[in-house]
């Protein structure tokens, strides 16, 4: 997309108000998502007493969202600069698929991680090592590397192996419109929908199995279930609308390309960026160990975050629902008092959290 003096290879820059608006919104969401997901990755490693495999997957999802935000930030910052140029190099279907390959990888890897987190929730057990922060060299396991390699292969299948016989020009790059074989596009959207939906089903099944247990695993599963419901709903809406646009354009060959690009910009790009922006906030708000780790890592958050003012999620029993009001012994302390208490290394034997951890390990 470099400036070129050849008018045959040039297209007029997009200067419509909608394009400026979308670019500005995506840049704001990308900056926020990049900063918060980078910080939440550090917090995930310190979120005891969550099991290490669960922390590892949550950190992997946060890294994925950080990469997605960084990619979108670079892309929109470049567009923001070149939109004022008198001539832009015309985008083709081949160059568009090359540009959007990292985006497809992030979407597939995110869906696969959500699916694995749902499956993993049915087999979690606390170990004594889970009470301590996770080492950085344990952040990536062999099977996580395998999943990433499979996601790269699937991304290549949906982009590089598309039989694009004609390198057609495009007004604006959109990966769903650049793939010439429509069944690949529908297969990609179907795969993402199924992975997110199946992951939610598995974590809801885990919450049913854990409903009678009063442990940190059950609290964490119920908290993650709330996050999964919101994020899966947003993903389903995004992917469903994107599929409708692709189907509309596939059925009606002479359709409004500008309308399709605008809808896909909103549904397929902005909504996932909004999810990546909200994901760290959901984790800190709903998951109690994440809140505790966040305030221990960044004590300044005690003044801004209503840490421990919320009780853990309700854990329904077979006949009724019960709320376990567990609060930190630091609930009424200021940040200075908290730091002073931690400097004295006061034992936490009276903390409700330690009692529950012992129950988990005893199980």
Swiss-Prot record:
The chain crosses the membrane at residues 20-40, 63-83, 101-121, 141-161, 186-206, 227-247, 268-288. Coiled coil: none annotated. Residues 329-363 are annotated as: Disordered. GO terms for cellular component: membrane. The keyword Membrane applies. Keywords: Membrane, Transmembrane, Transmembrane helix. Its main location: membrane. It is found in: Membrane. It is a multi-pass membrane protein. It comes from the Eukaryota. This is Uncharacterized protein T09B9.5. The lineage of its organism: Eukaryota, Metazoa, Ecdysozoa, Nematoda, Chromadorea.
């Amino acid at each position: 997309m470099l400036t070129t003096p050849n008018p045959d290879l040039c297209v007029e820059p997009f200067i419509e108000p909608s394009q400026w608006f979308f670019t500005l919104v995506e840049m704001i969401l990308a900056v926020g998502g990049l900063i918060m997901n980078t910080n939440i990755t550090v917090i995930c490693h310190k979120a005891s007493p969550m099991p290490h495999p669960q922390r590892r997957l949550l950190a992997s999802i946060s890294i994925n969202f950080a990469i997605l935000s960084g990619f979108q930030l670079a892309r929109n910052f470049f567009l923001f600069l070149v939109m004022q140029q008198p001539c832009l190099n015309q985008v083709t279907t081949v160059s568009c698929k090359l540009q959007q390959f990292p985006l497809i990888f992030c979407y597939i890897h995110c869906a696969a991680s959500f699916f694995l987190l749902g499956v993993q929730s049915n087999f979690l057990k606390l170990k004594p090592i889970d009470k301590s922060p996770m080492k950085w060299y344990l952040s990536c396991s062999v099977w996580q590397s395998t999943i990433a390699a499979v996601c790269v292969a699937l991304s290549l299948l949906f982009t590089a192996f598309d039989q694009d016989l004609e390198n057609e020009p495009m007004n604006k790059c959109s990966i769903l419109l650049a793939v010439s074989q429509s069944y690949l596009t529908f297969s990609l959207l179907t795969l993402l929908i199924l992975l997110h939906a199946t992951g939610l089903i598995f974590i809801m099944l885990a919450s049913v199995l854990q409903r009678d247990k009063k442990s940190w695993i059950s609290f964490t599963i119920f908290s993650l279930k709330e996050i999964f419901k919101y994020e899966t709903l947003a993903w389903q809406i995004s992917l469903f609308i994107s599929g409708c646009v692709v189907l509309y354009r596939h059925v009606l060959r002479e359709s409004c390309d500008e309308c399709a690009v605008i809808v896909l910009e909103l549904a397929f790009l902005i909504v996932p960026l909004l999810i990546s922006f909200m994901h760290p906030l959901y984790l800190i708000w709903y998951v109690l160990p994440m809140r505790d780790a966040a305030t221990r890592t960044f004590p300044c958050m005690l003044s801004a975050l209503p840490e421990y003012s919320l009780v853990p999620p309700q854990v329904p029993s077979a006949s009724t629902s019960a709320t376990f009001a567990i609060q930190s012994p630091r609930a009424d302390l200021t940040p200075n008092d908290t730091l002073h208490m931690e400097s004295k290394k006061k034992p936490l034997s009276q903390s409700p959290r330690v009692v529950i951890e012992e129950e988990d390990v005893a199980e």
